[in-house]
A protein has these predicted regions:
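Extracellular carbohydrate-recognition regions
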Residues: 2-48
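Extracellular beta-strand elements of beta-rich domains used
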Residues: 31-32, 221-226
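Extracellular glycan-recognition surfaces and repeat-rich motifs
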Residues: 39-69
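Secretory/extracellular carbohydrate-interaction modules
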Residues: 72-144
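Short, aromatic/His-centered strand-loop micro-motif at the edge of beta-sheets
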Residues: 149-171
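Localized edge beta-strand/strand-to-loop motifs within extracellular or lumenal beta-rich domains
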Residues: 168-182
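Short strand-turn-strand beta-turns centered on an Asx-Gly dipeptide
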Residues: 185-188
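Flexible glycan-contacting loops in extracellular carbohydrate-active proteins
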Residues: 193-223
């Protein structure tokens, strides 16, 4: 089993770069196109948190296409939650069943609430909408938390705002072993969690945004990748 390439942060020790499906389950989306639906089993499911919002693939910040852009409506609180339709990744207290997650994200404006990571359901990511997950949460004032949530109980670690500059991509990721979740920003370890990991709960990758002002604001996603050893 070949070790993962130069991204040593959240993917350190992961299988790859060419992953044998007998070794691990993997989702990788580079967003040159998107299959989406509001209710059926078509890749990404979209739930409106509030308002009329858009989800599309276009060139946003990196100049070469292949970017997913979620744009809110123009009223404070407008936004979407987007999640993979099948929650197929399960944190396990079993050696050798590790999970690796990362996403490359950027904000069009710093006044955005953002959620990105793994969660148990396609619903409002803000406040108490999600009952189980492992993810990053960023409030509209920039307060950013590395969070493990189990049955609505949180283990939060506040970290420096990694998205304090609009239009700049940042890699947010984590590695979950049989005992601990370690969070990374641009490959550097920033937090750990162990008390509220939702052991045994099926999770799926998600991205969500809410605008913090009466203006359309967006989150761009260059790519998302999830791996779990079988």
């Amino acid at each position: 089993m070949i070790a993962q390439g130069p991204s040593n942060g959240p993917f350190g020790g992961a299988p790859g770069p060419h992953i044998d499906p007998a070794v691990a389950a993997v989702i990788f989306d580079d967003f040159f196109s998107i299959h989406k639906n509001s209710s059926d089993e078509v890749d990404w499911l979209i739930s409106a948190i509030q308002g009329t919002n858009t989800v599309e693939c276009k060139t946003q910040y990196n100049g070469s296409g292949g970017e997913l852009v979620l744009t809110s409506g123009t009223t404070t609180g407008d936004g979407d939650h987007m999640q993979w339709h099948h929650v197929g990744f399960k944190p396990l207290e079993t050696l050798g069943r590790d999970i690796w997650f990362a996403a490359m994200v950027a904000l069009s404006h710093i006044g955005v609430e953002l959620g990105v990571g793994l969660a148990n359901q396609n619903t409002d990511f803000s406040d108490t909408g999600l009952t189980n997950g492992i993810y990053f949460h960023r409030a509209t004032d920039g307060t950013t938390t590395a969070r493990a949530r189990d049955g609505g109980d949180d283990e939060d670690t506040e970290i420096s705002d990694p998205l304090s500059s609009a239009g700049v991509y940042c890699e947010l990721g984590f590695h979950v072993t049989s005992a601990i979740a370690t969070f990374y920003v641009n490959g550097s370890r920033v937090a750990e969690a162990s008390a509220e990991i939702p052991w045994g709960t099926p999770l799926g990758p998600f991205v969500g945004l809410v605008t913090g002002g009466d203006a359309a604001r967006a989150v761009a996603v260059d790519w998302i990748k999830v791996i779990q050893l079988r």
